[in-house]
Regions:
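Conserved acetyl-CoA-binding loop-helix of GNAT-fold acetyltransferases
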Residues: 82-96, 109-117
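A conserved beta-strand-loop-helix scaffold within acyl/acetyltransferase catalytic domains
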Residues: 34-37, 63-70
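Conserved beta-strand-loop-alpha-helix junction that forms the acyl-donor binding cleft
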Residues: 102-117, 121, 128-129
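Residue-level detector of high-confidence beta-strand sites
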Residues: 64, 123-125
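Conserved GNAT-fold acetyl-CoA-binding loop/helix
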Residues: 25-43
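A short, internal acetyl-CoA/4′-phosphopantetheine-binding micro-motif in the GNAT/acyltransferase core
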Residues: 68-85, 104-105
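Conserved beta-hairpin
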Residues: 51-63
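Conserved N-terminal entry element of GNAT/NAT acetyltransferase domains
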Residues: 1-12
Length: 134
């Protein structure tokens, strides 16, 4: 049986977040497509780490979700794409905080589907991004 849970972010997860954030299979989905050093990650987490949660699958970290300036940021280990982990994380996040938005690159079909499946509606569209709210 698969057990998913969200836990509070902690320093031992900073590198997990960085690895998920910079994985080539995930990087294309981020608004800022840049490589992040461990030091840059630590500095960012020192500032925003409390705004993130880690998704554990049977006790192992497989994803993260966070909100910075009302904007949802998330990633799932590519080995677990398509298994509902993104939807699980976004759904749990929305239970905790409905005052959130999502900015998705127009070609990021997977994230678009996740947000729509969690009740988000498109409210704005431009050349590069889709903007969703609840």
């Amino acid at each position: 049986m698969v057990n998913l849970e969200l836990v509070l972010n902690a320093p031992e997860y900073y590198e997990v977040i960085r690895e998920l954030r910079t994985d080539p299979k995930n990087l294309h989905g981020f608004v800022e497509q840049v490589s992040i050093t461990p030091e840059q990650q630590k500095n960012y987490m020192d500032k925003f780490g409390n705004d993130y949660q880690i998704c554990l699958r049977n006790g192992e970290p497989v994803g993260f979700v966070g909100v910075v300036d009302k904007d949802i940021r998330f990633a799932v280990n590519p080995n677990y794409h398509g298994q509902g982990i993104g939807k699980f994380m976004i759904s749990k996040l929305v239970e905790q905080n409905r005052d959130v938005l999502a900015k998705v690159m127009v070609d990021n079909v997977a994230s678009k589907k996740v947000f729509e499946s969690c009740g988000f509606k498109l409210y704005k569209l431009d050349e590069n991004f889709l903007y969703f709210s609840l």
